Amino acid sequence: MKINQLRVEDVCDFIGGSQPPKSEFINTPEEGYVRLIQTRDYKTDEFPTYIQEKSTKKFCDSQDIMIGRYGPPIFQIFRGLTGAYNVALLKAKPKSCIDREYLYYFLKQDAVFQYVDKLSARTGGQTGVDLVSLNKYPIRLPEDILDQQRLVSVLSALDAKIDCNNRVSGELEAIAKMLYDYWFVQFDFPGTDGKPYKSSGGKMIFNSTLKREIPEGWMNGTLDDIGKIVGGSTPNTEDPDNFTANGTPWITPYDLSRNQGSKFITRGLQDVSEKGLKDASLKKVPVGTVLLSSRAPIGYMAIARTEMTTNQGFKSFIPIKSYSTAFIYYTVKGALKTITHYASGSTFKEVSATVLKTVKVALPDPRVVDQFSVSVASVFERQDLLELENQQLTQVRDWLLPMLMNGKVTVA
């Protein structure tokens, strides 16, 4: 296999996006409009933006390699969306000498990220990719395109399995969410006769506090009635003894941003030591606790897979006797718009425990909650296993990636 020693500028071009005025943005698609892809869109599909197609000449398709230009975190590598793209994204356009998949995996290497992150300038509190430095980065490139494709085929196969697992988990999530809505939003949970309660004429009572009808026997309450709400804190980061490699998982909102697409979380980037727990008066939350980021940003959620703790950017819900993890998860998720609306703060928006205790919810008959929890238990268990398998596949892929790129591992 003949290898060429080149630089990034020899194998691809970087094309910046455009930024039409926000006054032209709309939130629902119309004829003549195209989606404006932003960094956030690769993490959530909840806030799409559309612009007139004629207002830009910068477009990408689902196969294009897109790079997050600003941070933190800087230099995120994306693909999978079609539309126009804004100035916060770069498109890496491969030249004829390199296979697109090979370029994609090359740019995803941690070594490349560390190089870019170290040399990219920080201005106005925001880091931007230094393209001059990136273009000088060396790349070891097999001359034959077929050799390039052979090398990355292993990585593509691992990613295909991860994507398959994600699709299955997404389908399971749709089933569980549909059941929750059917029972607790439409009130068609199984009645005593086994028939859908409201549709079969189950008695509904107007609740003056909630200002709507709820099933007879249900009550009004607030979010703190379905789980014990606890916060977190941060140990002194200047004392290295407060952190350790294998201590208690300590979760930050950034960890949840990296965990988007997953329902459960095991740990973040850092663990705290026993000293850190004590010095910051950190409280451990048990398995099954529902984590909610309460600032920077608000609304990221995950379920604790192990005993853990969090920083001050969280309000976590520890399940109490009558309400399960599954019920809390979907109830809080359904209240996110209200929660965000009540957020306050001059520097950045934040939701306090006091605010959460004012968010009104309907409190079902505990027997209905128990029945729901049993019904979705297998879904949650299957999703958990799929996510754990994906973690293992990701570890294998991330180990193989630099080995394949530097020639320490070859593919026959």
Predicted segments, located by residue:
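Non-catalytic DNA-recognition/assembly elements of restriction-modification systems
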Residues: M1-Q19, R140-V152, S156-Y182, S200-T234, ...
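Sequence-specific dsDNA recognition surfaces
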Residues: Q5-I26, E31-I65, Y85, M204-L210, ...
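A short beta-sheet element
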Residues: Q38-T39, Y50, S55-D110, T252-Y254, ...
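A short glycine-rich beta-alpha junction/loop motif
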Residues: G83-L90, E101, T123-V152, S294, ...
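Short, positively charged
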Residues: E101-S133, S324-A362, A412
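Short, solvent-exposed loop/beta-turn-alpha elements that line the ligand-binding surface or hinge
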Residues: G194-S199
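Hydrophobic/basic alpha-helical segments
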Residues: G261, V287, S324-T325, Y329, ...
